[in-house]
Design a protein with these regions (language model features):
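Asp-box/BNR beta-propeller blade signature and adjacent active/binding-site loops
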Residues: 1-372
Length: 372
């Protein structure tokens, strides 16, 4: 079933694009319930030193959950902006005190965002540096050392490519990083991927643009084309954020990310905030995003091995009186470990303090009814 749009401009763009329905008509998007068996845990709260937090990441490695994010003193991407992180040794129930991972002592560069990857049983963290908010300068690589439990700097590459998801492994053994590219020290509005032909993280990566620029067929432009992938057999499907037009977009590649078709409109109503997607160990795909602005964070599940999404739940919906959280929950990232899917995201304190943010995790068993 196609979506109903509130503006003629949105409706016009959809008519100009190829379209696929991937969400079943039977899914009651407006009245999704809470996912069965869930638990919520605050990973880190705002502090006097760092009132602002955003763009979290999470991964499971050797039985430990690793989380990371960027902080700023008071406003988004202003002032001292480091990458910090925490670990959980009990499946996300409790978290260690935040630790510093990467920063610029001179204060000239901003660090944002972090992503994780595992290669040859080694954990890596990758992050960007910026000369100002979302003006990309470099891509940095860090490797985790279990002997001292720290991430160590490996190298910096002058690649103005903004990261968005953890490292993906392709069926051909190569690695994929979805994101967006810019000119050096400029704003990235062109969707693209990086590919590691060697299948190694600490190796050269090459750029493939998904489209030549950020223009859409109706003359509007992609602003923050944040990407997230589902990889099944020979098909890569990438969901793309679309700010100016509330038309959900995706791109597809059948040759390992070398060439792309799209944009294609679809009917999962995620558009103007970050989307995260992946595949569970049981073969079901999932996609997570914000509904109704950012006051709802929801997840949809597919049938195994397909892009037919037949069930969905809310991860968060509205004001939380227990935690006193204003309803803005956004920028999800997820990983599966020990039979659970762990979803980390930005949380926000009450509306009167819109720039005060922390990180939260919702975990639930993949044996729940929707995930089986």
């Amino acid at each position: 079933m196609r979506l109903t749009y509130q503006t003629p401009e949105d409706a016009q763009l959809e008519t100009m694009l190829p379209h696929i329905d991937i969400l079943a008509d039977s899914v009651p998007v407006d009245v999704l319930g809470k996912i069965p068996g869930y638990s919520d845990t605050v990973v880190t709260r705002p502090t006097r030193e760092y009132l602002f937090l955003h763009e979290t990441a999470i991964i499971g490695y050797h039985g430990t959950l690793f989380a990371a994010w960027y902080n700023s003193p008071a406003e988004e991407l202003k002032g001292h902006t480091p990458i910090r992180g925490a670990r959980s040794f009990d499946g996300g129930k409790t978290w260690s005190a935040p630790e510093l991972i990467a920063y610029d002592p001179s204060g000239k560069l901003l660090y944002c965002p972090p992503v994780f990857g595992i290669c040859d049983d080694t954990l890596y963290l990758l992050c960007n540096t910026m000369v100002s908010a979302d003006h990309m300068h470099s891509l940095e690589f860090y490797r985790y050392d279990e002997s001292d439990e720290k991430f160590h700097f490996l190298r910096s590459e002058p690649i103005p490519f903004k990261l968005n998801t953890n490292v993906c492994t392709l069926p051909n053994g190569k690695l994929l990083l979805p994101g967006r590219i810019a000119e050096m020290d400029s704003f990235p509005n062109t969707p693209a991927v990086l590919i590691s032909d060697s299948g190694k993280i600490d190796a050269p990566w090459r750029l493939v643009k998904i489209q030549e620029n950020g223009d859409l067929p109706d003359g509007s432009k992609l602003v923050h084309p944040e990407l997230s992938a589902i990889i099944q057999d020979g098909l890569i499907t990438i969901f793309c954020r679309n700010d100016l037009r509330k038309v959900p977009l995706l791109y597809q590649s059948g040759d390992g990310g070398e060439t792309w078709s799209g944009p294609i409109s679809h009917n999962i109503p995620f558009s103007s905030s970050k989307i995260y997607s992946g595949t569970l160990s049981n073969g079901k795909n999932y996609v997570i995003g914000s509904l109704s602005g950012r006051n709802r964070l929801s997840i949809f599940f597919s049938e195994p091995g397909t892009l037919e999404f037949t069930s969905g739940y809310d991860i968060r919906n509205g004001y939380d009186p227990v935690l006193d959280l204003y309803p803005q929950f956004s920028y999800p990232v997820a990983c599966e470990m020990d039979g659970k899917l762990h979803v980390i995201y930005t949380m926000q304190t009450p509306e009167r303090q819109k720039c005060i943010r922390g990180a939260m995790i919702t975990s639930f068993p993949i044996s729940c009814a929707a995930c089986r």
